[in-house]
Amino acid sequence: MKPYADASFIVALYLQQESSKAATAFMQRHGEPLPFTPWHRLEVRNAIRLSVFHGLIDASQSKSQLKQLDVDLQDETLLVHTPIDWVAVLREAENLGAGKSETLGCRSGDLFHVAAAVELGCDQFLTFDERQKKMAKAAGLLVKI
């Protein structure tokens, strides 16, 4: 299996959440780093920063987790920088949206992650977002979380 994780899954590896135990358990079983695109970089890092705004963590915890994210990317233990054809991803996202957004209610960001998974040739999709799970299944991806 070649998994692709959205930001909800990756953030659960860095911030203590209800879903953290499931995310950590998957990574221990899987044992391979997950693709990490520039879109992930923006979304994951911003989610960690927003946790300070929402009072879930303090600024020092945010700084520590952002540093750990960078270490993990450098070590390629959990995540690996992954180049991607953004034009192809946007086209795939539009195709997915045209076929399913009216019935599944997916947002553009949801479509973007599913399209990226398809473009990277992944066959498994990791998310804690219910709408995204439905879209990933509709795109033919196995949803395990």
What is each of the regions a protein language model found here?
Residues 2, 25-35, 39-105, 111-118, ...:
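PIN-domain endoribonuclease scaffold, especially VapC-family toxins
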Residues 11, 132-133:
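Glycine-rich nucleotide phosphate-binding loop and flanking beta-alpha elements
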Residues 16, 106-107:
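A conditional alpha-helix N-cap/helix-loop micro-motif detector
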Residues 106, 125-126:
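Conserved SAM-binding loop
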Residues 142-145:
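Short hydrophobic/aromatic-enriched beta-strand-loop microsegments
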